[in-house]
Amino acid sequence: MSRWKELTGGTSGQDYAARFAALARSGKDMHGEARFCASLVPAGARVLDAGCGTGRVMIRLARLGYECVGVDLDASMLAVARKQAPELPWFQADLAEFAPAALGVAADFDLVVAAGNIFPLLAAGTEATVVERLAAALRPGGLLVAGFGLDEAHLPVPPSITLPEYDDCCATAGLTLVDRFATWDADPYDGGGYAVSVHRR
């Protein structure tokens, strides 16, 4: 069982969406992840939102002209995503078993994004497998972008993966670190409790 399901019980979609809607109404910028991804690949590029949740990032990217596919294991989150953007392709799948061909999806993405603490919330011991699956979905030269917390101040659960461990998973999957930032606004990484990492296949 994933740490996410242990945390939420798999019934979190509406609550999660409501929380972000409230933040948006308060004036908070809700599109940093999409803006960051858009700075890396041009409009029209194929983007996989791995752990897409309610679709906040993917819907924004689609509106910016990207060809997007969303994958998540949480049915309640996907229900919200499908309601908000029924025209977009949303798939329910475990990232540790993700096989694009089985879903009728070409494995030639220009960018795979895993926002929202995806890696710390995976089922224990599946991190390397998930990186391998996501790397395999990239075209040569494609980018894996992952942002996640590294300490309890930035996570709803105890930390479960360090940056060296994540980088080792990426290296094993044939990915090379390109850059690392402290925020989705591309602030330089300062060794703090949150990191956005960019690896290239």
Map each language-model feature to its residues.
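Conserved class I S-adenosyl-L-methionine
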Residues: M1-G53
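Class I SAM-dependent methyltransferase SAM/SAH-binding core
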Residues: T54-A99
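A short acidic, Gly/Pro-enriched loop at the edge of an enzyme's catalytic core
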Residues: A101-L111
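A short SAM/SAH-binding and catalytic strip from SAM-dependent methyltransferases
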Residues: D110-G125
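A short glycine-rich, Lys/Arg-flanked "PGG" loop and its adjoining helix->strand segment in the class I
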Residues: A128-P140
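Conserved beta-strand signature within the Rossmann-like core of class I S-adenosyl-L-methionine
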Residues: G141-G149
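Short alpha-helix
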Residues: P159-G174, R180
